[in-house]
Amino acid sequence: MPTAEPARKPLMSGNWKMHHNHLEAIQVVQKLSYALNAADYDAVDVSVHPPFTDLRSIQTVLDADRIPISLGAQHCHWEDKGAFTGEVAPTMLAKLAVAYVIVGHSERRELFAETDDWVNRKVKAVLNARMTPIMCVGETLPEREAGQAEAKVDGQLRAGLAGLAAAQVSGMVVAYEPIWAIGTGQTATPDDAQAMCAAVRAVVADLYDRGTADATRIQYGGSVKPGNAADLMAQDDIDGALVGGASLDPDEFARIVRYRLTE
């Protein structure tokens, strides 16, 4: 008798980047919570990833009001302590009840020269601190036009997951973000996004096994908006969205979280 594939609960993550001070952040989270209900949280996991300076304020609000939104961070170092001016340790984030940490976002790779090796170290550090990494992969427009999109993502995945056990990978999140679509208003078509997310799952299956690949959640990111969320989420291998600009507005982000109501 065939075994049903494990259900992958969608994860909608709002990456606020360098936006919202702590007072604005409190208002956004409260407004977002007013727009969502128990049925939404049953259907979808939700995380918000504010700047470091907002984390404590948001954690206090989430705890006090018992809001079932997970707290996330945008970045961390791989060491627990040391002479790393300006950096934040994963263990420090864990003490603030951070659940998810974005690792290897293209802006970190491009603007701050983060390498695949650094990404791998951070993924391991986040896991060791008992948080869930959201590891980002994606290609540039020239790489896509040259037919190298899958090869680029393949390399990032193999390097980023190096040394990890299957059980660790099955519990983490991979976010496929075509770099050319981030903040540009351009979006990969649902078919293109599905093809790349399926390719991500195939690499995980090749590195580990089909069960691990089927359990791993894969997000799509890149100009996700209320108008395209449902079409993207209808794809077999897309298990959520890593949302940038649209997550800054609580009403817009709520509409994305509630994509199933617009299908």
Describe every region a protein language model picked out.
Residues 1-263:
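Active-site loop-to-helix "anion-binding N-cap" substructures in soluble metabolic enzymes
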